[in-house]
Amino acid sequence: MVVAKKMHVAKKMSKEELREDKVVTAVKRLGEFGQRNIRYIAGGAALLLVLIVGVAFWSQNRTRAAEAASLGFSQAQQLYFSGNYAEALARFQAIESQHGSRGAAQPVSLFIGNCQLSLGNPTEAESAFRSALNRLSGDPILRAGAQRGLGAALADQGKMAEAAAEYQKAAEVSDNPLAADDWLAAAAAYGEAGNSESARQAYQKIVDDFPSSIHLMDAKLRLAEIAARQG
């Protein structure tokens, strides 16, 4: 009886609820992926956590043209989250080629950059993220993701001063849920570039503006180290 009741309820789910359920599933996979790769994500290099908003944006803003790419996008995501970056990249590039990367397809360009980063192709990743920034509309969260990806691509090329500037741009995006992470990445990059004052300011931003961040103690420790070096 219980099983039958559950089946009856499932049949009454609206299209909106089904779409939301797909978003929740994608978010859960994203969270599991982040937990497995947090060492890389926190460092800002090799991998970039694609924002949940981007996944939801794709799922909730479909047009008839985008419906044709929906299945391919879902399959490409599964490949990406399972670590099959080469095949995922080919799928995302095919979607971009056939459907473009504007409107609801904007997250595709971010996934392409992420795949290139994960495959150890920082130059190609830089190109992908710069292209994404040129095409993105006014969505600030997607722009923050592209700036963060560009910072990671530059850092992987050893261009630490440029990387720091891009991380800072991402951190300064209004309502960026990963702002503290971006300030931490910016501070580390500034430090590696030899700009201790900018590094200090970035760490201080975490202390001042994000007192509940998991990076708070790390920021305080780095500030103490900088102060000790400066005598």
Predicted regions and their residues:
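TPR-repeat structural position
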Residues: 85-86, 122, 160, 196
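N-terminal positive-inside, membrane-proximal cytosolic segments immediately preceding the first
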Residues: 2-44
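Short solvent-exposed coil/turn linkers within tandem alpha-helical repeat scaffolds
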Residues: 96-105, 134-143, 171-179, 207-218
